[in-house]
Amino acid sequence: MSSAQDPFYIVKEEIQDSIDKLQSTFHKWERISPDMGDQAHVAKELVATCGSIEWQVDELEKAITVAAKDPSWYGIDEAELEKRRRWTSNARTQVRNVKSGVLAGKVSSGAGHASEVRRELMRMPNSGEASRYDQYGGRDDDGFVQSESDRQMLLIKQQDEELDELSKSVQRIGGVGLTIHDELVAQERIIDELDTEMDSTKNRLEFVQKKVGMVMKKAGAKGQMMMICFLLVLFIILFVLVFLT
């Protein structure tokens, strides 16, 4: 089965896309000022999204475990199985890193540092500009706060849109994952039924062989010769009917 047709790679691509969006949203979340009340809301949604992606990775690992029981049936080898295990492990690590970063409250210091410098400059105007600061400082500060607030709100809006899209992607992956799981279970059931049928057929053949052996033994040498002759005549008749008519 090619990679384009393999359900594993379809789900893998969806999950990787979700992880990329999650990391992008996380990096934007790091730049949100802690003073913004929406930071906690976005953090909560990030953690929830991490949990959803981890669930998808769990389902994919279950599918790998099922495929590992009979790789030849699914057209894969041990090297491919190991490759898939490494990918799921790496995906889980990426999600765990984002989740740990959110829970630890690690935010970049860029915006905070800029605000601190701004406040220092406001508190320490030079003597030549003191009067101008008294006149316009408050207005500049209000404008800066408003601009910073607008930037933060725009950033939060973008994150909400990305989280909504990420949630839809996770739901879509969940549906595909469940479909794959159901298909694997159905195939495993078919294999079990085939094994049972083969065992039953084998038992019937052994029974027939024993019966034939008993009949041959009871018939003796003369009876065996007569049976062989009968089978030979029957074979000749069938040959004539099939190939000469």
Curated annotation (Swiss-Prot):
InterPro entries: SNARE, Syntaxin-6/10/61_N, Syntaxin/epimorphin_CS, T_SNARE_dom. Residues 153-215 form the t-SNARE coiled-coil homology domain. GO terms for biological process: abscisic acid-activated signaling pathway; exocytosis; Golgi vesicle transport; intracellular protein transport; plant-type cell wall cellulose biosynthetic process; vesicle fusion. Pfam families: SNARE (PF05739), STX6_10_61_N (PF09177). One of its GO terms (molecular function) is SNAP receptor activity. GO terms for cellular component: SNARE complex; trans-Golgi network; trans-Golgi network membrane. Induction: Not induced by osmotic stress or ABA treatment. Coiled coil: none annotated. Expressed in root, leaf, stem, flower and silique, but not in hypocotyl or young leaf. Strong expression in the vasculature and in guard cells of the leaf epidermis. It is a single-pass type IV membrane protein. Vesicle trafficking protein that functions in the secretory pathway; the fusion of phospholipid vesicles containing SYP61 and VTI12 is triggered by YKT61 and YKT62. Together with VTI12, required for membrane fusion. Involved in osmotic stress tolerance and in abscisic acid (ABA) regulation of stomatal responses. Plays a role in the exocytic trafficking of cellulose synthases (CESAs) and the transport of cell wall components to the plasma membrane. Belongs to the syntaxin family. PANTHER family: GOLGI SNARE BET1-RELATED. Interacts with VTI12 and either SYP41, SYP42 or SYP51 in the trans-Golgi network or with VTI11 and SYP51 in the prevacuolar compartment to form t-SNARE complexes. Core constituent of the SNARE complex required for membrane fusion at the trans-Golgi network. Also observed in the SYP121-complex and cellulose synthases. Colocalizes with PIP2-7 and SYP121 in trafficking vesicles and at the plasma membrane. Interacts with SYP121 and PIP2-7. This is Syntaxin-61.
